[in-house]
Amino acid sequence: MKRFLVGGIVCVLLMLPFLSSCVISKTGGEDGFHYPAPALLPGTTSAMNTPGFWIGIHPDPDRVVIPAEDLEAFNRTIRKETGVIQDPSSFPETFQGSRISGAAQGSLRFISSRNYFRQDGTRADAEFFSGIQEQMNLSAIPEEVPVRLALVTSYTHQRILPTDEELYSSMKSTDLDRLQNSAYDIGTPLAVFHATRDGRWLYTITPLSEGWIKAEHVGYCTREQMVHYLNAEPFVVTTGSKTDLFLDQGLRRHHAYARMGCRFPSRDTGSPGVIEALLPFRNEEGKCVLKGAFVMAGQVSRGYLPYTPRTIILQAF
C-alpha cells in the first residue's frame, strides 16, 4: 500500500508541469508561453507616454542646444573630414571603370559565398548567381565611366544585387533580407554609373551608400539642376514618420509619402493648412521634371526645426 502511495505521489509530481502549462495557456499566447506586454511597466505612469510629461519636467525645454549656423558648420566638417557622407553634385565628370566594376563584382562575390536561402527555401546556388552576373553585364563598363546625375522620383530600395528576390541567412529569419542595402525617399540625389543588360537596374552612389536602384525610380538631371533643387529656398522639412504627398490642393489624390527629415522646396498655396512642395518626377524620356505636390502644414516644418529639448522630445514621440 505504501509503495502504491509513493508511486501515486510521484506520478502527480511528474504531471504538474503539464497541468500548469494547461492553466497558463488560458492567459498566455496560443502556445502557452508568450504573454501580452503590460500596458505600463512598474514604476511608470500613463502620463509618461506623452511628450508633454517630459517637456514639463525639463528645466529649460526651449533652450537652443546648438544654433543653426553651428549645426551647418558641423555638418560641413562631417562631410569633409570623414568622407562617410558624399555629395553626388560635386563628383567629377568621370569615374574609373575599375572602381565601379570592382565594387559591383565584390558584392556579388561576397553574397554568393554566404550560403543564403531563397524565398522558396532552397539555397541560392551557382545557377542563381550566374543569372544575376549575366544581367550585371560588368564587362560593358568602360575604362572611364561618365557620371550621370539624377534625383529619386519614387520611394525606392537600393539593392546589393540587381534583383527583387530576397535572400535569407536562414528560413527562421525571413524578416531580414540580406540583399537590402538601403531605401531612399523622393528627392534623394545620386550618381548613375552603369545599367544592367535589360536596363531595369542602375548602379548608383547616393550620399550614404552604393548599390542597384530601379531605373524607373530616378529622373536624370544636370549638375546645375541638382544643386539648385537641393539648396532652393524657401523649403519645408517633413516631421512625421510618414508624411503624405498629394497631387491636389484638396489632399485627395495621394501620390506618395516621405519619411521624417526630407527637405523639399516649397511655396504657399493661399489655403490654410496646406503647403505646396516641389517634387522631382520622371518623364517619358527618363529626365527629371519638377512639379508641385501638397502636404498638410502640420506634417512639415518651414525650414529646419530648432535644436531644442522640446523638439527632440516631440520628434521622439
Segments (PLM) and residue ranges:
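Boundary regions of SH3-family modules and the immediately adjacent low-complexity/disordered segments
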Residues: G28-R159, E165, D175, I205-T243, ...
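Cys/His-rich short segments
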Residues: W201-Y203
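Secondary-structure boundary elements
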Residues: Q315-F317
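Bacterial N-terminal signal peptides
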Residues: I9-F18
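Bacterial N-terminal signal peptides that target proteins for export
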Residues: M1-I9
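Conserved beta-strand/loop element in small beta-rich adapter and peptidoglycan-binding domains
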Residues: E81-G83, P92, Q105, S173-T196, ...
